Regions:
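Interhelical loop/hinge segments that connect adjacent transmembrane helices in multipass membrane
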Residues: 1-9, 199-242
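Alpha-helical transmembrane segments of multi-pass membrane proteins
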Residues: 104, 108, 119-143, 157-161
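Helix-loop junctions and terminal segments of transmembrane helices
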Residues: 62-78, 149, 206-207
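Alpha-helical transmembrane segments of multi-pass membrane transport and lipid-handling proteins
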Residues: 89-118, 168-169, 176
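Interfacial transmembrane-helix starts/ends
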Residues: 9-10, 47, 82-97, 225
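Signature of the first transmembrane helix
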Residues: 8-69, 94, 103-107, 167-168, ...
Length: 263
């Protein structure tokens, strides 16, 4: 049994490692195409938007993507399918809640972020238009945590490839036809595509069910939030530093400098 377990670990380590290499290669191609089509200023604008999105998402997510794995995995390991299904519904419900919270944060802080980053309010509308990304990302991380918890590693690996490929295929046309004006729609559409890719592989395992008005789900999810808060605090510090560096470079330099820093 130990030999079989060891072989299983080695097999999937190699498999996931190969998938990771492929994903990195696709990301490199995407970044190179972005640099050619957008110039360093466009890359800098995209990087700045992504740092803001990342900070708001990780702050509003409450660590659900991290803490939810533990409870689902415990029920799955103990062979309690009913409890697994219930917990999956709780995770998905909380993912939607946190996604809506992230959208609200993005809308509320868009004026302040625009002023801090660019010294004026010219980017309020683009930042507001990015608010749906918060919802898409919340659902995405919820689905990947569910698949990890029930050990569907092949699906997790396939999702990584599909997500990278979807981002490449969906962003390049916007960059090619609209240049810097295509940065915001590219981010929205590519994030939507990644979410759809995740759902296409997770829904066959667990059909979509949420209850946004359930008090029971709200109470049951608090255990995940308590576990996730320390994780969120650490992540928020890291993300705030990354966003702060981008904002500093923008204020004291230019978007081209941010693009060069990110590249």
């Amino acid at each position: 049994r130990e030999d079989a377990t060891y072989d299983h670990i080695v097999k999937y380590t190699g498999f996931l490692g190969g998938i990771q290499v492929l994903t990195i290669l696709v990301s490199v191609v995407r970044n190179k195409l972005a640099a050619v089509l957008l110039s360093t200023a466009g890359v800098g604008l995209s990087a700045l938007y992504q740092s803001v999105i990342g900070f708001l998402h990780n702050t509003s997510n409450l660590g659900i993507s991290f803490s939810s794995i533990k409870e689902i995995a415990e029920y799955y390991g103990e062979n309690h399918p009913e409890k697994v299904l219930l917990q999956v519904e709780v995770v998905r419900t909380w993912s939607v809640w946190t996604g809506l919270a992230g959208m609200l944060l993005c809308l509320l802080f868009s004026p302040a972020i625009s002023y801090w980053a660019f010294g004026d309010t010219s980017h309020i509308l683009p930042l507001c238009l990015l608010s749906p990304v918060m919802g898409f990302m919340a659902v995405t991380v919820g689905e990947i945590s569910i698949l990890k918890a029930v050990r569907r590693l092949k699906r997790v690996a396939l999702i990584s490839v599909l997500g990278a490929a979807a981002t490449l295929l969906l962003t390049v046309p916007f960059y090619y036809f609209w240049g810097m004006s295509g940065v915001v729609p590219a981010l929205v559409v590519s994030t939507l595509g990644v979410m759809v890719a995740h759902l296409s592989l997770s829904l066959p395992v667990f059909p979509w069910r949420v209850d946004l008005l359930s008090r029971a789900y709200f109470r049951k999810g608090w255990s995940m939030v308590r576990v996730g808060v320390p994780y969120i605090m650490a992540t928020a510090v890291n993300m705030s530093v990354a966003m702060g560096i981008s904002l500093f470079i923008t204020n004291w330099g230019s978007l081209s400098d941010v693009g060069l820093y990110g590249m």
